Amino acid sequence: NLIQFSNMIKCAIPGSRPLFQYADYGCYCGPGGHGTPVDELDRCCKIHDDCYGEAGKKGCFPKLTLYSWKCTEKVPTCNAKSRCKDFVCACDAEAAKCFAKAPYIKENYNINTKTRC
């Protein structure tokens, strides 16, 4: 679920504040999303949005699904025991790893999505 996703990001990026830093970043980080991603981090969010979309098509509820995972040396790893839990956990884990590799560009936080996306 979204709280677990936030904790996965904290695992991959210790000291981060996901609910503040990523809730309104670029065109895809946060609720909704459209247009062309503004940078690598925003592309991570688009991939995550698309993954949640695929989970929904499989009959899963990604924003609500609780799963089991662990953090080892800044790497989130899934221990899910069902198809939906495994799929959603993988969406979140891959996104957290993607976030960790992408630069955070302050100018892309809270952008005008009407003109930039």
From Swiss-Prot:
GO biological process, one term: phospholipid metabolic process
Name of the protein described by the UniProt record: Basic phospholipase A2 pseudexin B chain
Biological role: PLA2 catalyzes the calcium-dependent hydrolysis of the 2-acyl groups in 3-sn-phosphoglycerides.
Chemical reaction(s) catalysed: a 1,2-diacyl-sn-glycero-3-phosphocholine + H2O = a 1-acyl-sn-glycero-3-phosphocholine + a fatty acid + H(+)
Tissue: Expressed by the venom gland.
Disulfide bonds: C11-C71, C27-C117, C29-C45, C44-C98, C51-C91, C60-C84, C78-C89
Molecular function per GO: calcium ion binding; calcium-dependent phospholipase A2 activity; phospholipid binding; toxin activity
Keyword Membrane in record: no
Residues at which Ca(2+) binds: Y28, G30, G32, D49
Cofactor annotation remark: Binds 1 Ca(2+) ion.
